[in-house]
């Protein structure tokens, strides 16, 4: 029971070397043993084992799919029928969902077994998983450091082998950054590829769900099950426009067109933005990423210097748009319809004030205030509309190098974050420093492009470093193909933290 990749577990289940119930019990015991990481907010062993037994019956009847019986953990932002769905907040501490999110529904239809709900920054607002009402998550590689956020619980669970895979969400880097900090693989698809129905909203024009696992191959299997048009999500891409059901693993193991097995990436042009390799990049991260790029050159790729000149504007742009959308989305949590309600209050207005004051944490309150300010009369044009204009310019930066007659490269690569994971508590007193940690991921989210992180080595204090791969719209299959080729030539994705 040492295998921890989805592909290996699926093969064991198909060969009847192990049952789904045995797998579920194995991972439930690992979750219990790894409780010190605080990666999970909720586990329901009986519900998990019931799903596992149903998967075993499906396998016995010959109706199994490739994912049937494989366990998975869900970020606690995806509602799951009969399970608590807290979004890491006291505001939703006792909320039990009557329905499944589309992501949960589709993975369940594929036969996957839910292990539990993973910890996260409150309402996905954070880069360290220290903003959770249920306490901070610890990085399995060094318990004094953060795992990244906001999908830190999912990243820590996969890294520590408490789960072979997990779901995450990425608004400004919340799949890629924790994947990098925790030494696993994670992909944020093109905006609209994965349904947001049943995903508790932070910033609706940015939020996107995606898979987190040990390998690119596993992420491809998961994304194939998760993605596709959903009429219940108004932002879901329609069939023929990116919303088709797709086999994202179809190119894995194949050399690029015109290449061969010895040099599978021959002809690939990798763009290196000069803005991603400037003075703000830590030396250990720079060295590790450069070594990974050298490995890709050995596989036949060519490195090309490019520029994304509006990168520096991504932080102020994001921190106008995202809080504005958050202030609107979170207005529904008033203590009346659902969510935390204050025990004592004078009147209705006092109940609203006290319920929200008690239910929301400081970072969420900060972003609600910022969002309400930039949407207010007199400031809407000056801030929000200007930010939306800059957002379009940032998106055009990417198209200038990835598309058109003057296309300079096929994919873009660089670091995921400027540093390795920092120590718990190191940046909580200075939110701006925390925000700067997302400088290399925010622009991709603002543009709606797919991006992923793959393990690329280790930096200071033996902490993982991720290599970021950014593609043009709908190019996830090629990104996964490239990531898989890199992982076939390296073993960073197989490294695990000490028990």
Curated annotation (Swiss-Prot):
Its EC number is 6.3.5.7. One of its GO terms (cellular component) is glutamyl-tRNA(Gln) amidotransferase complex. It catalyses: L-glutamyl-tRNA(Gln) + L-glutamine + ATP + H2O = L-glutaminyl-tRNA(Gln) + L-glutamate + ADP + phosphate + H(+). InterPro entries: Amidase, Amidase_CS, Amidase_dom, AS_sf, GatA. Keywords: ATP-binding, Ligase, Nucleotide-binding, Protein biosynthesis. It holds the Pfam family Amidase. Allows the formation of correctly charged Gln-tRNA(Gln) through the transamidation of misacylated Glu-tRNA(Gln) in organisms which lack glutaminyl-tRNA synthetase. The reaction takes place in the presence of glutamine and ATP through an activated gamma-phospho-Glu-tRNA(Gln). Heterotrimer of A, B and C subunits. Belongs to the amidase family. GatA subfamily. NCBIfam families: gatA. PANTHER family: GLUTAMYL-TRNA(GLN) AMIDOTRANSFERASE SUBUNIT A, TRANSAMIDASE. This is Glutamyl-tRNA(Gln) amidotransferase subunit A. It comes from Ralstonia pickettii (strain 12J).
């Amino acid at each position: 029971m040492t295998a921890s990749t989805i592909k290996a577990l699926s093969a064991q289940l198909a060969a009847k070397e192990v049952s789904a119930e045995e797998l579920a019990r194995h991972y439930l015991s690992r979750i219990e043993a790894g409780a010190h990481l605080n990666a999970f907010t909720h586990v329901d062993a009986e519900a998990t084992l019931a799903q596992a037994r149903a998967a075993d019956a499906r396998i016995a009847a010959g109706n199994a799919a490739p994912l049937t019986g494989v366990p998975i953990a869900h970020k606690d932002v995806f509602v799951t029928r009969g399970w608590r769905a807290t979004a890491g907040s006291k505001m939703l501490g006792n909320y039990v969902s009557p329905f499944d999110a589309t992501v949960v529904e589709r993975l369940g239809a594929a036969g996957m077994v839910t292990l539990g709900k993973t910890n996260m920054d409150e309402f996905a607002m954070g880069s360290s998983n220290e903003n959770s009402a249920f306490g901070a998550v610890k990085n399995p590689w060094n318990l004094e450091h953060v795992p990244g956020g906001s999908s830190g619980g999912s990243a820590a669970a996969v890294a520590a082998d408490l789960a072979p895979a997990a779901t995450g969400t990425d608004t400004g880097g919340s799949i890629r950054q924790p994947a990098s900090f925790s030494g696993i693989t994670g992909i944020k698809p093109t905006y609209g590829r994965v349904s947001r129905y049943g995903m508790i909203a932070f910033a609706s024009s940015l939020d996107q769900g995606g898979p987190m696992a040990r390998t690119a191959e596993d992420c491809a299997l998961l994304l194939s099950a998760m993605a596709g048009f959903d009429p219940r999500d108004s932002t879901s891409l329609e069939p023929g426009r990116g919303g088709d059901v797709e086999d994202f693993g179809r190119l894995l193991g194949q050399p690029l067109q015109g290449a061969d097995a010895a040099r599978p990436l021959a002809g690939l042009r990798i763009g290196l933005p000069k803005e991603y390799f400037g003075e703000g990049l830590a030396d250990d991260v720079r060295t590790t990423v450069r070594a990974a790029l050298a490995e890709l050159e050995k596989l036949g790729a060519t490195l090309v210097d490019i520029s994304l000149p509006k990168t520096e504007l991504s932080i102020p742009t994001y921190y106008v748009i995202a809080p504005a959308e958050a202030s609107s989305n979170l207005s529904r949590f008033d203590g009346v319809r659902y969510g935390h309600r204050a025990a004592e209050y004078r009147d209705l207005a006092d109940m609203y004030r006290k319920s929200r004051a008690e239910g929301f944490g400081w970072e969420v309150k900060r972003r609600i205030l910022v969002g309400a300010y930039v949407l207010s009369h007199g400031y809407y044009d000056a801030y929000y509309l200007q930010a939306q204009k800059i957002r379009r310019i940032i998106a055009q930066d990417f198209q200038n190098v990835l598309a058109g007659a003057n296309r300079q490269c096929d994919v873009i690569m660089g670091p995921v974050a400027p540093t390795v994971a920092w120590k718990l508590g190191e940046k909580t007193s200075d939110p701006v420093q925390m925000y700067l940690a997302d400088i290399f991921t925010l622009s991709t989210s603002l543009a709606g492009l797919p991006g992923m992180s793959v393990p690329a080595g280790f930096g200071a204090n033996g902490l993982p470093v991720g290599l970021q791969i950014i593609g043009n719209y709908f190019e996830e299959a090629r990104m996964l193909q490239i990531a898989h080729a890199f992982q076939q030539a390296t073993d960073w994705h197989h490294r695990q933290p000490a028990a």
